[in-house]
Amino acid sequence: MKHYVAVDIGASSGRLILGKLVNEKLQLEEIHRFKNGFTYRDGHERWEIDQLMQEIFIGLEKVKQLGISECVLGIDTWGVDYVLIGASGEKLADPISYRDKRTLNAVQNLTSEYPREYIYKKTGIQFMELNTLYQLYVEERDLLERAEKILLIPDYIGYVLTGVKVAETTNSSTTQMLNLREQLFDKDLLSHLNIDVEKFAPLTDAGTYLGEVKEDWLKMYDIPNCDVVTVATHDTASAVVGTPAEGENWAFLSSGTWSLIGMELSAPINNEVAFKENYTNEWGAYGTYRFLKNIMGLWIVQEIARMDDYKHSFAEMAEEAGNYPYFKQIINVNDARFNNPENMVDEIRLYCRETGQTVPETIGELTNCVYGSLALYYALELEKMTEITGKKIEKLYIVGGGSNVAMLNQLTAKLAGIEVFAGPSEATAIGNLVVQMINQGEIESMRAGRKIIRNSFEIGEFSCGDVRFEEIKERFTKVLEFN
């Protein structure tokens, strides 16, 4: 029996999940979990990338302690951030987080020289200051000139493990530098940044064999012999693979630090309406496209908890939220002010004052405000997606950590007026494992993998119901008018 390990690292935590296929059912075991985050060093918010590598080795040593001497391994992480590699293969600096303030006004500055419509027509990717395109636009020229290669985070981890440099397509598409039609890094865009296209590794599809873990690591750590497979390395792409969807006319919501809501399509949509609504066409596994919108997500709730010194668990916060009427206060969760404020609680209260609303005081009221606002935003985006794609959405599959928040799932079902299915919470790791198993011939296809997922995990169901959607939507429109 083959053993598979998913290295799944999000913006706030990481984990190593051991998986195997037994009687057409996936069996999972969490082997190692660790925290992730950025710290302010050398003038920027930086990821502790060396510590992440150590955590991966710790996890693999735990796998070996289970008596497993050989395994297959795949890596997925958050998107857009990168590591600059020098001529000798060395890391030139710790990677800077997408939440760093260096890209403030970068979209405006770049698009004043290079029209938005032109960039969108080429790439089909939404405009966000965190995109790799804008990070490289403001990157230190000296570092860029010294860099032989630019590797996104999961590709860098794969490179450290195997010595092989690639640019996996699902994650590379999030950079806003891939040409949709040519399916290559866009030389014209890169020349505008004075970056040679050769600084990027060869594009590689999800499901491609990468290589063996280097002998040096096997000598340094007591870890299994691992064959590394390039999975859908963008965590959302893996989460969509791990969605237990069936049939047609469904949408997905990958709910975690970020909320990513969208549809899986066979072709991109980069027309004028999609451009106006700032929708993105990220590449998916096996020739698909993730037509989606980024929404701020549970980051806001995580920051409320941090400001409260973690006195309440997330479950307790949700329970407290249920004691108050929903939609008493509504915030625009995608307002840039909530990206990385000094104090999230103060920022929410200030927003409510500025928009003529009552001010949430307690942890329960604050959490209630955020969950209600998220559900409303989801419903509004589902409405827009139907208009843009011309496809009636009948089901929403919520996966990721946010799928455990029952009240958010129920609010979403009521506001959107469609049936909601929630779970599995570890969809990203599951999608990672499914791609590995397809590569190894244990699963036939992504469709077959989703059937296995449905048979392997409990999926929650939330029915739609009557709610004052139009009234709440009108109130939200008035709130936006204050901005």
Curated annotation (Swiss-Prot):
Its EC number is 2.7.1.5. GO terms for molecular function: ATP binding; glycerol kinase activity; rhamnulokinase activity. Disulfide bonds join 352-369. Its cofactor is Mg(2+). The keyword Disulfide bond applies. GO terms for biological process: rhamnose catabolic process. Pfam families: FGGY_C, FGGY_N. The keyword Disulfide bond applies. Keywords: ATP-binding, Disulfide bond, Kinase, Nucleotide-binding, Rhamnose metabolism, Transferase. It catalyses: L-rhamnulose + ATP = L-rhamnulose 1-phosphate + ADP + H(+). It comes from the Bacteria. HAMAP family: Rhamnulokinase. Belongs to the rhamnulokinase family. NCBIfam families: rhamnulo_kin. PANTHER family: L-RHAMNULOKINASE, SUGAR KINASE. This is Rhamnulokinase. It comes from Listeria monocytogenes serovar 1/2a (strain ATCC BAA-679 / EGD-e).
